[in-house]
């Protein structure tokens, strides 16, 4: 049975490696350049992979905190992205009426 008090990284170390390989792939680099106008920053994935591997060897608290901080920063970055448009709470009041081709769109 696994020890419940033993800390594990939020991801398996191989997941960090896979993310880094995906980030460096030609297809992903092209997609990021097309979408954002620049190549993706992939070094954080490799740094996290190396930190995770080092943590597996030494079980150092500094490495543990570095991995936790990296994941926290990554999650905060995802949550700060705002949607393209505001979500509405209710449908428009006249949603059920047939469309009028002569009516100008808003």
Curated annotation (Swiss-Prot):
InterPro entries the record matches: Pants/Emi1-like
Any GO BP: negative regulation of long-term synaptic potentiation
Compartments, record wording: Synapse; Synaptic cleft
Keywords linked to the UniProt accession: Secreted, Synapse
The record's account of how the chain is modified after translation: Rapidly degraded by proteolysis following neuronal stimulation, resulting in increased AMPA receptor clustering.
Entry GO terms, CC: synapse; synaptic cleft
Region (Disordered): 67-106
Protein task: Negatively regulates long-term potentiation and modulates adult synaptic plasticity.
Protein name: Synaptic plasticity regulator PANTS
Organism whose genome encodes this protein: Xenopus laevis (African clawed frog)
């Amino acid at each position: 049975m696994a020890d419940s008090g033993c800390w594990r990284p939020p991801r398996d170390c191989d997941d960090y490696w896979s993310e880094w390989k995906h980030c460096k792939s030609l297809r992903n680099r092209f997609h990021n350049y097309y979408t954002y106008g620049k190549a993706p920053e992939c070094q954080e994935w490799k740094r996290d992979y190396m930190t995770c591997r080092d943590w597996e060897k030494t079980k150092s608290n500094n490495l543990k905190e570095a991995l936790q901080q990296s994941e926290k920063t990554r999650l905060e970055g995802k949550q700060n992205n705002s949607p393209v448009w505001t979500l509405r709470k209710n449908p428009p009041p006249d949603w059920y009426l047939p469309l009028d081709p002569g009516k100008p769109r808003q």
